[in-house]
Amino acid sequence: MIKRSRNWIVANGVLWEKRVAVKSNIFIPILVLLFVATSTRGEFRAGIAVRVVTPDPLLPVSSGVGASNPVNKHEGDLTVRALVFADDDSKVAIVSADFLGFPSVLGDRARARVKGIPPESILIGATHTHSAPDCYGFADHSGKVSTDLKCVDLVCNRIAEAVNEALERVQPASLKIATGEANGRIAFNYYADQLYDPRCHVIQVIGADGKPFATLVNYAVHPEVLGSDAGILSPDLVGPLYDRIRGQGGGTGIFMNGAQGGMVTADNRGPDGKSLRTWAECLRIGTLLADEALRIVQSVPEQKNPKLSCAAKTISFPVESPLLRAVMKSSPLLAPTGDPNRVTTQLNLINVGSAQILTIPGEALPNIGYYLKRKMRGEHNLLFGLTNDAFGYILTKVDWGSFKRYDYISRTCLGEMTGEIYIDEALKLVAASPAPEKLIR
């Protein structure tokens, strides 16, 4: 007979719930759920820091499974950026890295090098540029892996440095939070033009002097204007986005992707319908997205001393895809250490002011994104895609293996039930966590 016992531990403002199954003298951990208390939160503070991670010499770049492609130049620098929110009880770091994806094994390595923020409160996402070195350890057709492991470890160091510096630089701050449709040719769904989410969510951080010093842009798009076969290493459209935000007085930019799976990509179509794979097109799209984000947030009121909380939950998925099983088996980074047929990852939910943020460990299709945003509890509901892990595409069971168009994204999805498991676990976390502040009466 299995009996259940429950233990609660409070440390550094974090409430831990450990549920343990007990059979004889064998203890099997089942679930860890935590959330950060905010009853005596004190003054809200924020800080941001950036590190350049452009490799020297340049390395081949990856757009997914298979061999990387050589490059002969770079346009813009690859960076990692850390935005830290803090009050007297809670500290949360949001990290954006200019890579295709950043697996949890690397995220955990970076988290272990951070001082002052619980690892469960450090969210690490990838911009999903298709013009950066491979961080997965993909094998080529011959089984050879060319990922530069020293470079990967250096990136982990740079992430930790950025988080530590951002924490050191926190200052009293207020927030401007806004949601609106980004106008113009920025994104479209390659599979069906209009099946994408045009909403752009913006969190702008205002210093005591009344000036913005950081602007977070959350928008769903594949930064693949250039692609991996152009011979160019680049942050793609995200680099010009950052440059424009700073140039227009928005401070340091940080981009977090959204539910951009299947197949929400940059709208770089020329007059003849063919893709314009040029740096000039990166400049156009990145600049336009920055201008739209700044327009959307411009006239909203500041939120003084916003409430902050962070929840984290460990979830797991079965690995049914033969392709992804092979990828994990051959990778020096992704090789399973436990059950080879399951993967686990961290799911986060953040409340900050009137916004609620939920992480997605991969590329969820836009219909999943719309559904989650409807069910979340903030006045502004943000989804951070490719955050804390990058497990390929995330489809519902009715989409998986359906249209011929969905063949590729079904093969690069963990399995038929991936979307169902994720949605269920995400909404349970939403229900178990406090609702964010409401400013609209």
Question: What are the functions of these language-model segments?
Answer:
Residues L289:
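Anionic-ligand-binding alpha/beta catalytic cores of soluble enzymes and soluble regulatory domains
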